[in-house]
A protein has these predicted regions:
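Short amphipathic alpha-helical interaction segments
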Residues: 34-45
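Short, cationic-aromatic polyanion-contact patches
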Residues: 3-5, 54-71
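Short amphipathic alpha-helical interface segments
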Residues: 5-30
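Glycine-centered, phosphate/nucleic-acid-interacting loop/turn motifs that mediate DNA/RNA or nucleotide
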Residues: 50
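Phospho-regulated, low-complexity intrinsically disordered regions of nuclear gene-regulatory
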Residues: 12-15, 37-39, 64-71
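Proline- and acidic/polar-enriched loop/turn elements at helix boundaries
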Residues: 28, 41, 58-59
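A generic secondary-structure micro-motif detector
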Residues: 2, 32-33
Length: 71
């Protein structure tokens, strides 16, 4: 279980490094090898640790790396 969660977190971070800010629904599209639940839980863990920033914009949520969160 820990290995899978670490892999999911690594894939989320890699996707953000490549894409910059990204809507939550697009993150799930960019990592088709993970279930929606795996992506969501990885985002939750990374956000709680401060490794990513999760912000609500209108009716959706956007993800970014902390250094890009001011954009």
């Amino acid at each position: 279980m820990h290995h899978q969660s670490s892999r999911a977190e690594a894939l989320v971070l890699q996707t953000l490094y490549e894409s910059g800010s990204l809507a939550l629904e697009h993150m799930t599209e960019r990592i088709p090898e993970l279930s929606w639940s795996e992506v969501f839980h990885a985002i939750d863990r990374l956000s709680r640790k401060g490794d990513i920033v999760l912000r609500r914009r209108g009716f959706s949520y956007h993800l970014s790396l902390p250094t890009l969160s001011h954009v």
